[in-house]
UniProtKB/Swiss-Prot annotation:
Motif stretch (MIT-interacting motif): 186-196
Intracellular or extracellular location(s): Cytoplasm, Cytosol; Endosome; Late endosome membrane
Region (Interaction with VTA1): 180-199
Lineage: Eukaryota, Metazoa, Chordata, Craniata, Vertebrata
BP GO terms, sorted: autophagosome maturation; autophagy; late endosome to lysosome transport; membrane fission; midbody abscission; mitotic metaphase chromosome alignment; multivesicular body assembly; multivesicular body sorting pathway
TM region positions: none
Chain residue ranges for the region called Interaction with VPS4A, MITD1 and STAMBP: 180-196
Organism: Mus musculus (Mouse)
Assembly and binders: Probable peripherally associated component of the endosomal sorting required for transport complex III (ESCRT-III). ESCRT-III components are thought to multimerize to form a flat lattice on the perimeter membrane of the endosome. Several assembly forms of ESCRT-III may exist that interact and act sequentially. Interacts with CHMP1A. Interacts with VTA1; the interaction probably involves the open conformation of CHMP1B. Interacts with CHMP2A. Interacts with VPS4A; the interaction is direct. Interacts with VPS4B; the interaction is direct.
Region (Interaction with SPAST): 174-199
Protein name: Charged multivesicular body protein 1B1
Family note: Belongs to the SNF7 family.
Biological role: Probable peripherally associated component of the endosomal sorting required for transport complex III (ESCRT-III) which is involved in multivesicular bodies (MVBs) formation and sorting of endosomal cargo proteins into MVBs. MVBs contain intraluminal vesicles (ILVs) that are generated by invagination and scission from the limiting membrane of the endosome and mostly are delivered to lysosomes enabling degradation of membrane proteins, such as stimulated growth factor receptors, lysosomal enzymes and lipids.
Biased amino acid composition, Polar residues: 170-182
Protein's membrane topology: Peripheral membrane protein
């Protein structure tokens, strides 16, 4: 097995590892969702919100790992073609040598930077790769969008068969529940007034 073939093997192995990490994140996300339901059932919205943030973070991280796995896999395919055709340039071989340590680190930013270097060795950079990079940089934010958290909380409450607004402890009712309650109160007041007028 030549050096280049060893590096190619490491690339393919890294793609599998990234894919495995993505699946692990999926598992963690499901576990966090189960914790959300339990917290909502106990009426503990603060804990439910924390688990919702964790679930969304795991989901985003899983997507990032999956995306990087696909990207490393695509580079491996290009290396395979270059090796098969005997067209491995010196500069390409240099970049490939630096891959091993970076791939072992499983650091998405370092792997991404390395993939950038490698892709520049190929003349045809497809548009798809650029789109992936843009999407990755926008999804690696550490903050969790609150609307996603709220939607996930509502979804978990629905699955648990709970009314999120009705079962919340006092002082934590959502604005939706409050506006519905006040509308119902207005309607009741009007009916009562009509009944009084009839008597």
């Amino acid at each position: 097995m030549s050096n280049m073939e060893k590096h190619l093997f490491n690339l393919k192995f890294a793609a599998k590892e990234l894919n495995r990490s993505s699946k692990k994140c999926d598992k963690e996300e499901k576990a966090e969702k189960a914790k959300i339901k339990k917290a909502i059932q106990k009426g503990n919205m603060e804990v439910a919100r924390i688990h919702a943030e964790n679930a969304i973070r795991q989901k985003n991280q899983g997507v990032n790992f999956l995306r990087m796995s696909a990207r490393v896999d695509a580079v491996a395919a290009r290396v395979q073609t270059a090796v098969t055709m005997g067209k491995v340039t010196k500069s390409m071989a240099g970049v490939v040598k630096s891959m091993d340590a970076t791939l072992k680190s499983m650091n998405l930013e370092k792997i991404s930077a390395l993939m950038d270097k490698f892709e520049h060795q190929f003349e045809t950079l497809d548009v798809q790769t650029q789109q992936m990079e843009d999407t990755m940089s926008s999804t690696t934010t550490l903050t969790t969008p609150q609307n996603q958290v709220d939607m996930l909380l509502q979804e978990m409450a629905d699955e648990a068969g709970l009314d999120l607004n009705m079962e919340l402890p006092q002082g934590q009712t959502g604005s939706v529940g409050t506006s519905v309650a006040s509308a119902e109160q207005d309607e009741l007041s009007q009916r009562l007034a009509r009944l009084r007028d009839q008597v």
